Amino acid sequence: MKKIIFMGTPSYATCILKALVENENFKLVALFTQPDKAVGRKQILTPSDTKAFLSQNYPSIPIFTPSSLKDENIIREIKDLNPDFIVVAAYGKILPKAILDLAPCVNLHASLLPKYRGASPIQSAILNKDEKSGVCTMLMEEGLDTGAVLESLECDIKDKNSSEVFELLANLAAKLILSTLLNFDKIIPKKQEESLATLCRKIKKEDGLINLQNARELYQKYLAFTPWPGVFLENGLKFLELELVDELKQNARMGEILELEKESFLLACKQGVLRIKKLQESGKKALDGRTYLNGKRLKSEDSLC
C-alpha cells in the first residue's frame, strides 16, 4: 500500500482526493490545504473544500494548513510522514525544492500541457474557443507547470461553461491519478515541447467587464467566467444567462433591443445577436429578460443602455 500526501484546496481537488482515499491500493497519510478563509458579508471563517470533506468523512487523517511550505518544521513533518508520492491538485502554493526532493510529486493540471500553464487553464481554453481540453499528470519541478507529462485524458468542452468543465475535468482527473500512480514505474515521462508552451494568468474580477462589440467574444467570456466573476457592463448590469443567436449580423445598432420574447429578449451587438435570458442590476434581484424590460418600460428598437 503506497503512502500518499495530498495537497489541494477547491472542489476540483476534492474529487481527486476522494478517489485516492477510497482506493485500497493507497493510504492517505495527510492533507495539505490553504488556511481557512473569511467568507461572505459576515466574514465567517470557512475551511477549504478538501478540508471540509476530509474532516467530516475521515477525521483521523491529519490536516495541515501552513501559510508557507518553506517552514523547516513543515518540511520535517512531510519527511517524517515518509510518503511514496505527493499528489498536488489546485493547491495554490508553490512547492520548494526541499519538498520536491522528498518523493515523486505528481501534479494534476487542467489542460493538455504545454498549453495553458498557470492559474486559469480552463477559462483560457474557453476564451480561446477551444473545442477540446483535458487533464494531465505531470512530474513536478521548480518551474511553473514545466515538468514532464506522465499521462493525459482529453474531452470535448464546446459550449460548456467553466463550472461544467471544472466538474468534467475533476472526474477525469480522479480516474487519471489512479492510473498514473498504479502504473508509475512503467510510465515513460514525456518532456514538454517548450516551443508549444502558453501561459495563463490568474482571473480577476475586472476580467468580467464586457462591451457589446462582438457577440461571439461576449458569449465566450460568459462561458469562461461562469460562475465567477460573471459578466457585466460598465454600469454594473450583470448578464446571468444568455445564448448566442447569431455571430455575424451587423445591420442593427449596438445595444438595440431587437425582439421581445416570452421570458427573454434579443440584443444586438455591433457584430452578432444575443438572447438575454436573465440579468441583474447592481444591488437588486435577478430578473428574466422580459420582466427586466417591462420594469424599465423598454420595448423593441429601444437601446438597452
From Swiss-Prot:
As for family, the record states: Belongs to the Fmt family.
HAMAP family named among the record's database cross-references:
Formyl_trans
Q: Return the EC number.
A: 2.1.2.9
An example Gene Ontology CC term for this record: cytosol
Instruction: Supply the InterPro entries for this chain.
Output: Fmt, Formyl_trans_C, Formyl_transf_N, Formyl_transf_N_sf, Formyl_transferase-like_C_sf, GART_AS, Met-tRNA-FMT_C, Met-tRNA-FMT_N
Residues spanning the signal sequence:
none
Name the UniProt record assigns to this protein = Methionyl-tRNA formyltransferase
Is the Ligase keyword given for this protein? no
Q: Name one Pfam family in it.
A: Formyl_trans_C
Q: Which UniProt keywords apply?
A: Protein biosynthesis, Transferase
Listed binding positions for (6S)-5,6,7,8-tetrahydrofolate are 111-114
Reaction catalysed?
L-methionyl-tRNA(fMet) + (6R)-10-formyltetrahydrofolate = N-formyl-L-methionyl-tRNA(fMet) + (6S)-5,6,7,8-tetrahydrofolate + H(+)
User: What one GO molecular function would you report for this record?
Assistant: methionyl-tRNA formyltransferase activity
Q: What is this organism's lineage?
A: Bacteria, Pseudomonadati, Campylobacterota, Epsilonproteobacteria, Campylobacterales
Does the record's keyword annotation contain Lyase? no
Q: What does this protein do?
A: Attaches a formyl group to the free amino group of methionyl-tRNA(fMet). The formyl group appears to play a dual role in the initiator identity of N-formylmethionyl-tRNA by promoting its recognition by IF2 and preventing the misappropriation of this tRNA by the elongation apparatus.
